[in-house]
Amino acid sequence: MRYNQLSYIPTSLETAVAELQALGFAVQQEQAPKENFAIFLRKLFFHFQDTDYPLSHMIASKDLDLLTFLTSDATLTKEVFDLVALQVLGFIPAVDFTDAQDFIQKIGFPIVFDSQQLLLNLHQLLATRQKSGVTLIDSLVSQGLLPMDNCYHYFNGKALATFDTTSLIREVVYVEAPLDTDQDGQLDLIKVNIIRPKASTAIPSMMTASPYHQGINETANDKKLHRMEGELSPKAPRRITVEPTDFQPLATKPSRLPVNECQETFSHISSYTLNDYFLARGFANLYVSGVGTAGSTGFMTSGDYAQIESFKAVIDWLNGRATAYTSHKRDYQIKADWSNGLVATTGKSYLGTMSTGLATTGVDGLAVIIAEAAISSWYDYYRENGLVCSPGGYPGEDLDVLTELTYSRNLLPGDYLRHNDHYQQLLSQQSQALERQSGNYNQFWHDRNYLPQADRIKCEVVYTHGLQDWNVKPRQVYNIFNALPDSLGKHLFLHHGEHVYMHNWQSIDFREAMNALLCQKMLGQNNGFTLPTIIWQDNQKEQTWKELTAFGGHSKRQIALGDDHVLIDNHYGEEDFKRYSKDFRAFKAELFEGKANQAVIDILLEEDLPINGQACLKLKLKSSENKGILAAQLLDYGKKKRFADIPAILELDSIDNGQQFAREALKELPFKDSPYRVVTKGVLNLQHRSDLLTIEDIPNDQWMTITFHLQPTIYHMAKGDTLRVVLYTTDFEHTIRDNSNYALTLDLEQSYLLIPTDEEE
């Protein structure tokens, strides 16, 4: 384990003492440090009447137990404090370490002992994570240090788990959205599942906008998958034009219906454990699936501002600006009189995507978004540079396939009976509008691009994204983060995992940092917390995170690619083509081993290469036909230790998100030997070699010069490492599987690689 403590808020001695005393630690500024130390330690064992017993099982040095030390005349030193602090945090001498001082350095222990400031040291110790992944104070509260009295209690600017999760209110309401997406003449109703504690004051809300949450239709999804095999068709040259998105909600008016209490409850809904963490700390949890999902009405419009409006309506209801009904009969309205109107949105992938879309509406009441692996432009999810480009791991998926997956109204037989025929008509229109045949950007995709509305965002923004996420690729967060107004509080966590959550990792106190931020923004805590702009996981060191100021450098390093001509054949023999089409992973493995149709350029680095941003290939090439796909990958090549892209479980049920509530596993990305690592990649339709909106002819056997930007990343390579450039045509995971007989020729002498290298240390 290594500490990267973001969440601790430095405080005054007076505040530290007051907070310690409020928790029952009877320390006093006037008392000697060793006496305060003993009082603090004995309070940790509040389950014991005889606290001598647990103290006797700890040590103060290699030859002295802690109880004996505390009752002796020996002085409290840094060595004693550090050794005891490690044990309090769950580290075991002779098991986790032998030399405490060496171990303190190795793990980056965040507390610097000062006998004159011991109470501040103890205050920080309570706010420091144990080996198990929870802070010492959270561990104590989970054991019953404080009662679950449904009132807010804070420590170091963060809410504690004092809300009773054994007696929660679970209710369902139906919010009226200013939409009629299924064209039935009635405003769409949006089902909202609410879980909230029995608080006596108005409370904020965590809202997860999840089109998956009311169920998914995998059968319909699988039937709708598109065939990847086909021929890349040349497109007529033209300039693509689009109009600004102009979504207009329908008119609504305040309801005059009588107000009633909730008429529908539920016992269970699958939850997100970060929400559970905040539920125990006095935040309501809302799960909303939006239009076209089971329990709601409307059509699944998949990514546009109508879908986003269905989630926005819920925030409007929480603030008294929209109507919610107790049932589909629409005969009683229900008020959110328990809400303080402030909302934070959470969730990964589609869920985080809806957070971004919501933020671009500028809706009042949305205080913070915590968007993980979020899409900012749906075109860039299903397309790339004029090509159909399936998300990593899901060849054949497209937006209409996602619609089939998430249109969960068809999982209700009555809804299927009444509405499926009309749904199929609307789905057919959607399938036509997404222009799969051409791969072009068009108005349909522009209406699902949130980047032009980024200047409307006014809430605090937190993004997390994996630099090995080839599902929702890094360009999605790179573009939205760099489009955000400078006036915003904006924060980005970049890790080296794939499409994964990171709130339960051992090496970074993400949960606690979000606690401090949300208490500041949603509970009025003037805690002085400041979250860095960018927190990046160092790819060269295990469990090490660094603070940066920018994603994307302005300095460029030019790297030559060679001095000869290379030919890349697109066509494969029938057996190989069938094998690769059946298993794209076999294609990837052979591509990385240099066994596919490709050009491979190995570059031995003569100096460190700190990549930050979009690597760019400047290439001179020609195609034997009037079409062509160019794909590229950059690899960190050669055996060495690197991060795996999926977090491993360190300890099951290690993290208690409340008081014996919603336990989850502690995880971390393994750091282990591997033969190579994908640094970045991309695909390009050569007819879009100038820009996305310009379609150009490809003249047969005539040289062209292209600029090809790959996916952005932050990745550091060292002197002596090998950077492998892989250039090829068809990508069996992502692009159309075109086996036609054409070839690309590259003039490497007239080509080069540009690497952005601005970095902060």
Curated annotation (Swiss-Prot):
Its EC number is 3.4.14.11. InterPro entries: AB_hydrolase_fold, Galactose-bd-like_sf, Pept_S15_Xpro, PepX_N_dom, PepX_N_dom_sf, Xaa-Pro-like_dom, Xaa-Pro_dipept_C, Xaa-Pro_dipeptidyl-ppase/CocE. Gene3D superfamilies: 1.10.246.70, alpha/beta hydrolase, Galactose-binding domain-like. Homodimer. Belongs to the peptidase S15 family. Removes N-terminal dipeptides sequentially from polypeptides having unsubstituted N-termini provided that the penultimate residue is proline. This is Xaa-Pro dipeptidyl-peptidase. It comes from Streptococcus equi subsp. equi (strain 4047).
